[in-house]
Structure formats: structure tokens, C-alpha cells
Amino acid sequence: MGLKARRPAGAAGGGGDGGGGGGGAANPAGGDAAAAGDEERKVGLAPGDVEQVTLALGAGADKDGTLLLEGGGRDEGQRRTPQGIGLLAKTPLSRPVKRNNAKYRRIQTLIYDALERPRGWALLYHALVFLIVLGCLILAVLTTFREYETVSGDWLLLLETFAIFIFGAEFALRIWAAGCCCRYKGWRGRLKFARKPLCMLDIFVLIASVPVVAVGNQGNVLATSLRSLRFLQILRMLRMDRRGGTWKLLGSAICAHSKELITAWYIGFLTLILSSFLVYLVEKDVPEVDAQGEEMKEEFETYADALWWGLITLATIGYGDKTPKTWEGRLIAATFSLIGVSFFALPAGILGSGLALKVQEQHRQKHFEKRRKPAAELIQAAWRYYATNPNRIDLVATWRFYESVVSFPFFRKEQLDPAASQKLGLLDRVRLSNPRGSNTKGKLFTPLNVDAIEESPSKEPKPVGSNNKERFRTAFRMKAYAFWQSSEDAGTGDPTAEDRGYGNDFLIEDMIPTLKAAIRAVRILQFRLYKKKFKETLRPYDVKDVIEQYSAGHLDMLSRIKYLQTRIDMIFTPGPPSTPKHKKSQRGAAFTYPSQQSPRNEPYVARPSTSETEDQSMMGKFVKVERQVHDMGKKLDFLVDMHLQHMERLQVHVAGFSPSKGASSPAEAEQKEDRRDADLKTIICNYSETGAPDAPYSFHQVPVDKVGPYGFFAHDPVNLPLGGPSSGKGHATPYAERPTVLPILTLLDSRGSYRSQVELHGPCSDRVSPRQRRSITRDSDTPLSLMSVNHEELERSPSGFSISQDRDDYAFGPSGGSSWMREKRYLAEGETDTDTEPFTPSGSLPLSSTGDGISDSIWTPSGKPT
């Protein structure tokens, strides 16, 4: 695009200088459109292309990373910008940017890479230089032979002259090409580059070769002495490795195994000096005799001779110039040779293995370096995929990039007449509106400046709403309705199109949604493609790489598991307590209940304190729950055992009773009912006196298996005593038992004769307490239900507290008892008479949930007032 268009002298150059000075709009008053079109056609531009190029280049200054090229359309006498601005608008440039600056930098970088970092075809040049240096060395060796001295000298002179020109030109190119690096720019940077060791070597070899070539093959003393400098060509072999890769590799191997090498060299040196000293002591006074019997000079005359012998021997060279003569010396030499040779040869093995490992590591590193480009491409594609998300309206930089590279034309109404617009399709209209769009470089969109190309010079120009830079930024932010409306207006030739705002200046706000969707699809495909390429580069290089990957994965898994465990502990563990240490509640040994104390009596008993604090971790809480479940099991076992013992004692008291059978008349049946009521009061009196003398009266249960279908007891109590001291006393219990289930005091059916206090007197009426008498009298309208619990039913109960019986034939009286007794046979733990139909609670709660100290006024019939 670097074409400059000649414009009339009166035309302002602000539009062409938009890249450096901010870019103003072209002045339409500077010349007519025809003259401008002629001038543009002279330089090979279509009408309007000058403004396109100028606008595109002016807007390019705002894009980060674009080249700042000089725009066209500048007048010869136009005043230049006093000072250019750099790429980041921070560093002012002292001179304008050259047109061939990019090409100059590209050639400079290419030469620097070929000389300093040879790859590909550059290796051929370095191979040629190596052959030249090797030929000079061979010819220098041949000059030492008398028969080849003359011929080899002539060829050596020609080859050295050629080598001087080659090396001189190469050195100059190296100094010049070093400017592509920022640290070697300027003359100071060039001096810094020339002070490098290899550059100093090149300078030294060039200086030494010039006088050798100058004197030629002269036979004087000066020429002969200068010819010795030819062997400095050997130093040129060092320049083959400009980057010092071999030396770096050797140094890294030595540094990696420095401890092993120092150990081997240290022990080998000790073996050398000790063996040499002992051999010197033994062999120093032994004279050497030749074949004629004459004494010769001693071989181990000094300690230095012994050190020489020891070094040659332990290094396994063995010149044989010095050997021990005595058997003592030979024995010492053999012993120390076996020890010292192994330590002298050990560094060679260490260096060999170290170099092999380093070479393998370099190959692996090269394999890993191949992942850099796919990784960078994947990161770039991932960001562009994220930035083109339609939901992220705040990310506009990526869309602006596409605005600068995707060309999307506008429509000019002067290019489309009404007849043509009706015949041409949309694609033809697009091509017609931008005839030279395909020839522009860089795919920069250049919106047309209609003001500069008017049909009539006398037509009044319209004011431009925004400058060129703003128009370029929003060039492709056009809505679909604006696009179709503008094309419609341009095709139909509507004179009101300009009034609507779609003639010269489009109200462009956003890109077409279809174009955005296409760009989004391309971003997704590129992201998946780069992701696939990056996964292909992640293939393991060798078995060691596989092991390292598995090890890294295992460590990562362990770290994640540890992190999860820490998070779980943080979730289930409360924060640090604020209570001081000396006031914290401590936990001691597990609390055990006394053998004669019910655990339900005092469930919350303070535990003794110790110096330990409770474990608040998740495992500690599991242990705590398990301990509590174990304690609950022990309590249930205790309750079941106590209840079974209680049932056994009740069975002992009623074992002797046997009810009469075969009632023949209603009178006899009524008499048996009265007798059954008397038996009930007798049992209540007997049980109330079996406990401790000071214990309060309480009602307990009688097993129902002793009750028959035709009487209260399975057998008639023919031998039941109604008086005397033995009738009120039974076997004393070892301790005061407390039943675990609340006793149910339900009276017999209304057929009984408990309707008045007069009928209350029976065989044991004198043994019933006043409270019991009032309770029996008050509840005389309901049958008495004595619960029957055996061991089988306790095992069938899930908790031991809900006790039931499933014998339907247990009934009271000849008629089988009441229906309420068959439905409600048990009272569960925590259940009160509120849950039963005939009773409602009234009064204060009992003193103990076990039945001790039950008030007689608690239970009142639900149908009677108290």
C-alpha cells in the first residue's frame, strides 16, 4: 500500500497524515472531484481509493501490533510532522521510518540466525568452512616434509588467502547482523558483541594470518619464523561450535557428578602418593647393573621419579622406562596397582554415564520444547473462544480485531442506478460497490469517503459526524436492518435515503449477527483442533517419562485426598473454643450406673473431669456415637432383666390360686364375680406389703397367662387366705424394685359391683389404703387391665419399651371381657392415659417416671367431673 497520490496544492494533507498526527477528514474545498480523479488515475488508483488507503493507514495507528506505514496523498510542499511517534506512542523517533525497514530487519535476522544459530541450509556453509580449516591444517603439516614442502606451500598460500577473505567477510556480517538483537544495537552493542570469546578468537586468527600470507614463500628468516603462525589455524576448529554446546554439556555433566568425581580423584591421589613413596623408600639405594656388570644410574634416584612411575602405572599406560627391581618393591607395586587402578578409571565411567544421561535429558527437553507452540496456540484459541462469547458484551477487543481484518463493503448510491439494482443480485452489488477491494493488502477495510467524490463539484458537502479513526473502528458494527435498508435505498435511488442517514454516513452500531455466529463457529473449531494437537504432543517420550507422569499423578491424588480430608474435618469440627483451658469440661472414664439404681431416674449425671478434651474430628464423633449406642444397649439390658425379675416374683404370689369352674346360674356367676373382685384386692394388698416397709404403695402387673377365659385366675383360689398375717406378707425382695412401665389401673366392666363405697368392703378391704380405695371407687366404671409381659414378647419388641401381647383369648369374665381391653393391651414408653380413650390427665406430674410416688389424684375418668 505504500503508494503516494499527487493531490492539488490547495488540498489539505490532514487525511493522508492521519497515522502520525491523528488524521483529519479530507477538505472538499481544496479542489474539484474531477481533478482529484485525474490525479488519482495518474498513479494507478481508482477514484476514491486514495481516501480508502489514507483512512486505513490513519486508523492503523490505533491498532496495537500493526505496522505504522506512511500514508499517501501528501503534498510535496506540505509540512512534515515535526517528530514521529513510536509503536507504543512513548518513544519519539528521530527520523521517519524507512519503507524497507521490515525487509532490512528480516535480512539482518536471517543472517544472524545462519551464522550464530545454524539450522537447515546454514549447516552447509559451516561444513564448507570446516573443510577449509581442515585443508589448511593438512597442508601446514605437509610443509614439514622436505619432499612436499614446495608444492604444499604454494597450495597453502592460495587456500589461506581465500580463507582470510571468507573469515573477514563473515566477521563483518556477524558484527552487522548482531544489531537485530536489542542488546547489541548501536555501536556500543556491536562492541559488546565483538568482546565475546569466539569473536576475539576470530580477530586473533585474522591478525595472525595476514602477515603469513603477506610474506609468502620467501626464504628469509622473517618468513620462516612467521610460517610457524600457520598452526594457529588449529584454533579455528574451536569456532565450529559457536554456541559452545559441547562445552556446556561437558560442564553440566561434571557439575552433576562433582561429588563422585572428587571422591574418586581424592582416593586415587592418596593411592598415588603412598605407593610412590613406599616404592621410593625400597628402591632408592638399589644400584642398577647392566649386562657388562657395570653399575648404572639409579631409576628411582628422586621422589619425582617415583611419582612418574606411579602415575604411568596407575593410569595403565606402562611405558616400562622405570620398574622396581626388588621383590619388596614389586609386591608394593602390585598391591597398590590393584587398589589405585580402579579409582583412576572410575572418573571415566562417571563422566561417560553422566554424559549419556545429559544427552538423554537434552533429547527429552527437545521433545518437551515441541509442546510450547501447541500450548501457546491452545491458550490463544481458548481465549478467543472465550472472548467471542455472545453473552460477554464487555469483551470488545477481539471483535475489533475482526473489524480490522474482515472486509465488509458499504453501498454507494451513485454506483447503483434503479434499473441496475433491480437486475443485479446481492453478491453482484457487493462486488460492484468495492471493485478494488481484493487488491488491497492486509485485508484492511477502507470505508468509502463519499464527500471527496461528488457527482457535481457545486454540490454542498455534508458535515461528517465523526472523524476517520472513529468511523474505521465502527466500520463493521452494522445492524442487519441498517444493511438491508441502505442497500434498498441505494438500489431504488430513493432521494430521501440521505435524509434517513444511510447515504453518506451509516449509523453503524453492531456487526451482523450472522457474521458473529460464523466467527464464533470458527473459534470453536480452532479451539478443538489446537486442543487435539496439544494432546498429541503429550505422549510420553520413554518409560521414564511414563513413570514420572504416574508418580506426579499419584502425588497429585494424595494431595487432593489430603485436601478433601482437611475440608471435611473443617466442616464437621467446630471452631476453637473460647473457654479457658482450666475451665473446660473434661472427659474421663465411662460412667457406670450402680447396680441398684435405674438409669432412667437420673439420666443426666455429671461426669468426672480429666485433663483430656473431646476429639472434635469426624472419627472422634463416630466413636462418640458408637459409645452412646453401646451405653443405650446396656441400659436396655438392665431394664429387661429388672422387668423379668419382677414378673417372676408376681408369678410366685399367684401360683396357689385356682378359680372354680362350671358356673350354672346367673346368681352363681355374679357370686363368682364378687369373689374375683375380692381376689384382686387381696393381690393388691399382698404386693403392696412385699416391698420395703417404708416404700409407698404402688400398683404392679399380674401375668395374664394366669387368667382364664371363665374366671380371673386360671385356677380357683380355693386355698386363698383372707386374713391373718400371712395373707399380707410375702417373700421380701432383696431391694426395692421399680417397674419400668407405668402401671395401668383399669377396673373391671360395669357389671362388677363397684358402684358404691358400701360395696367396696371385701375380704381385704381393711388392707387397702384410703388413696387406693378412692381410686378404685372413682374408676369403678371401667375394667381393670393388668398387663401380661413375658420374655418372648420382650424379644419381639424392637426397643423393649413397647410391650404388647397377641393372645386374643385373654379376656376377663365369662363373656370374654370388654372390647377396649382387646384393642388397647399395652402402654408404651412415654405414653400416658391421654393416648387412651377413657382417661385424660389431670393434676401434677408424678414424682418419678418409674412409678415411685405416683399421686392417686392424677388419673380421672374422662366422662366424670372430679
Curated annotation (Swiss-Prot):
It is found in: Cell membrane. KCNQ2/KCNQ3 are ubiquitinated by NEDD4L. Ubiquitination leads to protein degradation. Degradation induced by NEDD4L is inhibited by USP36. Phosphatidylinositol-4,5-bisphosphate (PIP2) potentiates the activation of KCNQ channels by enhancing the electro-mechanical coupling of the voltage-sensing domain (VSD) and the pore-forming domain (PD). In the closed state of the channel, PIP2 is anchored at the S2-S3 loop; upon channel activation, PIP2 interacts with the S4-S5 linker and is involved in channel gating. Calcium suppresses KCNQ2-KCNQ3 channel currents, with calcium-bound calmodulin inducing a change in channel configuration which leads to the reduction of channel affinity for PIP2 and subsequent current suppression. The chain crosses the membrane at residues 121-143, 154-175, 194-213, 226-244, 257-282, 327-353. Residues 303-315 dip into the membrane without crossing it. A motif (Selectivity filter) lies at residues 316-321. This is Potassium voltage-gated channel subfamily KQT member 3.
